[in-house]
């Protein structure tokens, strides 16, 4: 790309830093390789010498003679409508957006985040619709498969498993039923001994003799 922004008489420049930062001026005369005589009659910048390092050249050029007086510079500026043209450029819009972003609060940043999420969601749904329409238009076989997949997904989404209700009344009824069931069960009968078997009787000990025989 050919460079076209040269230092010349009538070139409009943007002041990037200094006491007049953010304003536009027109180059009236070139003093030397480091400085130029500038004037900004419509931006409240008086005629003065300014170094090139604090200026950024724009694409706008005014037509007025060398070292012209301020009234001629003002007339050329208003005729070219520089302020309106500058406000419509991407450069000026970026500067304005940067300034507005620096002044934002936390709530403003939150609102911007929510708006971006909503925008992305809308874009995604529209893209999916266009893709589906293109797929249906491309081949009838794929269209049938896509329709079946969409119907299956909708049916699966609509079919929600019913959860068992566990309210206090139902809990009490369940506990009562379990208690009745436990009461109705019979205790297991004790184990019986085998038939024909008798328990052995214990013999009483024999009394001792009163005396010994002679």
UniProtKB/Swiss-Prot annotation:
<dbReference type="GO" id="GO:0003723">
    <property type="term" value="F:RNA binding"/>
</dbReference>
<feature type="modified residue" description="N6-succinyllysine">
    <location>
        <position position="203"/>
    </location>
</feature>
<dbReference type="GO" id="GO:0042273">
    <property type="term" value="P:ribosomal large subunit biogenesis"/>
</dbReference>
<feature type="repeat" description="1-2">
    <location>
        <begin position="175"/>
        <end position="179"/>
    </location>
</feature>
<dbReference type="GO" id="GO:0005737">
    <property type="term" value="C:cytoplasm"/>
</dbReference>
<keyword id="KW-0689">Ribosomal protein</keyword>
<feature type="cross-link" description="Glycyl lysine isopeptide (Lys-Gly) (interchain with G-Cter in SUMO2)">
    <location>
        <position position="124"/>
    </location>
</feature>
<dbReference type="InterPro" id="IPR039660">
    <property type="entry name" value="Ribosomal_eL14"/>
</dbReference>
<dbReference type="GO" id="GO:0006412">
    <property type="term" value="P:translation"/>
</dbReference>
<dbReference type="Pfam" id="PF01929">
    <property type="entry name" value="Ribosomal_L14e"/>
</dbReference>
<feature type="region of interest" description="4 X 5 AA tandem repeats of Q-K-A-[AS]-X">
    <location>
        <begin position="170"/>
        <end position="189"/>
    </location>
</feature>
<comment type="subunit">
    <text>Component of the large ribosomal subunit.</text>
</comment>
<dbReference type="GO" id="GO:0022625">
    <property type="term" value="C:cytosolic large ribosomal subunit"/>
</dbReference>
<feature type="region of interest" description="2 X 3 AA tandem repeats of K-G-Q">
    <location>
        <begin position="192"/>
        <end position="197"/>
    </location>
</feature>
<keyword id="KW-0963">Cytoplasm</keyword>
<dbReference type="InterPro" id="IPR014722">
    <property type="entry name" value="Rib_uL2_dom2"/>
</dbReference>
<keyword id="KW-0832">Ubl conjugation</keyword>
<feature type="repeat" description="1-3">
    <location>
        <begin position="180"/>
        <end position="184"/>
    </location>
</feature>
<comment type="similarity">
    <text>Belongs to the eukaryotic ribosomal protein eL14 family.</text>
</comment>
<dbReference type="GO" id="GO:0045202">
    <property type="term" value="C:synapse"/>
</dbReference>
<dbReference type="InterPro" id="IPR008991">
    <property type="entry name" value="Translation_prot_SH3-like_sf"/>
</dbReference>
<feature type="repeat" description="1-1">
    <location>
        <begin position="170"/>
        <end position="174"/>
    </location>
</feature>
<keyword id="KW-0597">Phosphoprotein</keyword>
<dbReference type="GO" id="GO:0003735">
    <property type="term" value="F:structural constituent of ribosome"/>
</dbReference>
<feature type="repeat" description="2-1">
    <location>
        <begin position="192"/>
        <end position="194"/>
    </location>
</feature>
<dbReference type="GO" id="GO:0006364">
    <property type="term" value="P:rRNA processing"/>
</dbReference>
<feature type="modified residue" description="N6-succinyllysine; alternate">
    <location>
        <position position="85"/>
    </location>
</feature>
<feature type="repeat" description="1-4">
    <location>
        <begin position="185"/>
        <end position="189"/>
    </location>
</feature>
<keyword id="KW-1017">Isopeptide bond</keyword>
<feature type="repeat" description="2-2">
    <location>
        <begin position="195"/>
        <end position="197"/>
    </location>
</feature>
<feature type="region of interest" description="Disordered">
    <location>
        <begin position="158"/>
        <end position="214"/>
    </location>
</feature>
<dbReference type="GO" id="GO:0022626">
    <property type="term" value="C:cytosolic ribosome"/>
</dbReference>
<feature type="modified residue" description="Phosphoserine">
    <location>
        <position position="139"/>
    </location>
</feature>
<keyword id="KW-0007">Acetylation</keyword>
<comment type="function">
    <text>Component of the large ribosomal subunit. The ribosome is a large ribonucleoprotein complex responsible for the synthesis of proteins in the cell.</text>
</comment>
<feature type="modified residue" description="N6-acetyllysine">
    <location>
        <position position="79"/>
    </location>
</feature>
<keyword id="KW-0677">Repeat</keyword>
<dbReference type="GO" id="GO:0014069">
    <property type="term" value="C:postsynaptic density"/>
</dbReference>
<protein>
    <recommendedName>
        <fullName>Large ribosomal subunit protein eL14</fullName>
    </recommendedName>
</protein>
<dbReference type="InterPro" id="IPR002784">
    <property type="entry name" value="Ribosomal_eL14_dom"/>
</dbReference>
<keyword id="KW-0687">Ribonucleoprotein</keyword>
<feature type="modified residue" description="N6-acetyllysine; alternate">
    <location>
        <position position="85"/>
    </location>
</feature>
């Amino acid at each position: 790309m050919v460079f076209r922004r040269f230092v010349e008489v009538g070139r409009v420049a943007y002041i990037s830093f200094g006491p007049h930062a953010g304003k536009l001026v027109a180059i009236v005369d070139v003093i030397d390789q480091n400085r130029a005589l500038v004037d900004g009659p419509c931006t409240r910048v008086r005629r003065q010498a300014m170094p090139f390092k604090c200026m950024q050249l724009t694409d706008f050029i005014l037509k007025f003679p060398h070292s012209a007086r301020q009234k001629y510079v003002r007339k050329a500026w208003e005729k070219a409508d520089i302020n309106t043209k500058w406000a419509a450029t991407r450069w000026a819009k970026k500067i304005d957006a940067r300034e507005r972003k620096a002044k934002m609060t936390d709530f403003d940043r939150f609102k911007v985040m929510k708006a971006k999420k909503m925008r992305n969601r809308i874009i995604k749904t529209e893209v999916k619709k266009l893709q589906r329409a293109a797929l249906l238009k491309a081949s009838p076989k794929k269209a049938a498969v896509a329709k079946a997949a969409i119907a299956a997904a909708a049916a699966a989404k609509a079919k929600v498993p019913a959860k068992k209700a566990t309210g206090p009344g139902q809990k009490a009824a369940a506990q009562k039923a379990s208690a009745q069931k436990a009461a109705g069960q019979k205790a297991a009968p004790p184990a019986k001994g085998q038939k024909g078997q008798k328990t052995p009787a214990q013999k009483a000990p024999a009394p001792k003799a009163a005396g010994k025989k002679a």
